Amino acid sequence: MHDLVDFKGAIHVHSRYSDGSDGMETIIAAARAAGLDYVLVSDHNVLKAKTLGWEGWHDGVLVIIGCEISPPRSGHVLALSIHDCDGMKKMSPPEYLRRVREQGGIAFVAHPSGNEIRDFNLNLASWKDWDNPDYHGMEIWSYMHDWIEGCHIRNMLEYIRNPQDHITGPQPDVLQLWDQLAQSRRIVGLGALDNHAANLPFRKLPWKILKVFPHEQVFRTVRTHVLIPPPSRTNHGDVDSFIDALARGRCFIDYALLGDGTGFQFTASQDGLDYQMGDSLPAGRPVGFRVQCPQPAEIILLRDGAAELAADGTALEHSTDGRPGAYRVEARINRKPWLFSNHICVRAGEEEGKKKRR
């Protein structure tokens, strides 16, 4: 596990190839200026950026191209590692998830709670197909959807001037659902942006007054850190390595305005074997959990969504008797949400995978 590299970046970004306002060059420059290692662009119902060769390394930034499959009356997903999304927006979730799987792709539920705000021409259906086995994970924190809750025409300027004052963190019901689902199978949790670098007014009017939430600004907020083997700096190998790590849940989320989460670790050990976020290990034998934060915080270890242990500082260690459960970590700074790990699951009957001996 110690040879993994922390790759931090932005997930769920829109370009001019759908309804974003900026081209790929601008997005990549913003990612580099914000100190990101990667950016994941997921335009609505198109893979044009991939077709035109944008996936891979550009100016030191790894660009991943996916597609936000966006039916008008059902939930959306971010689909990765696919080559064709034509017609999927007219399909039901079971149909398009099957198409993604048949192409060897993976899917993550986007903004699972949906949203409807008439002032901003926003009408997104919530996700209903939680029992479907063909999705790999879900956005647990979406920056723009967090910000827009409570925003309307009368207070919009205040929300734009001071967006950080209106960010509250993941919705509790989304975290509760995530913890519940993770008890039966791996469900990867992502931090996402859903950023368009939009122009005001948001409604489809013939004139535009002001660009709000430019990408560089938003790229310094909710980020997903993905733990990957040292990159080779070759396009296909590093893209595949990144997507594989994401699918395995080798990732955590930080809110960078409170501090850079680079260096965060959440691991488990059992019988001389080490386990990483996204792993499962057998129940019934002692397990040791270790947490390391890059700066002091309130650290909370949760089991099935309930606090198991909390500590202030940069480290937490906890030993259990191997009780089944989906274990994860939250960290807060000044009572504000900062870090969210993915789960390490202890399951009855779980087969031991190939783990690294210490």
Q: Model-derived features: where do they sit?
A:
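C-terminal functional module detector
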Residues: M1-D6, S184-G189, L193-R358
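A metal-dependent hydrolase metal-coordination microenvironment
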Residues: M1-E158, T168-S184, A192, A198, ...
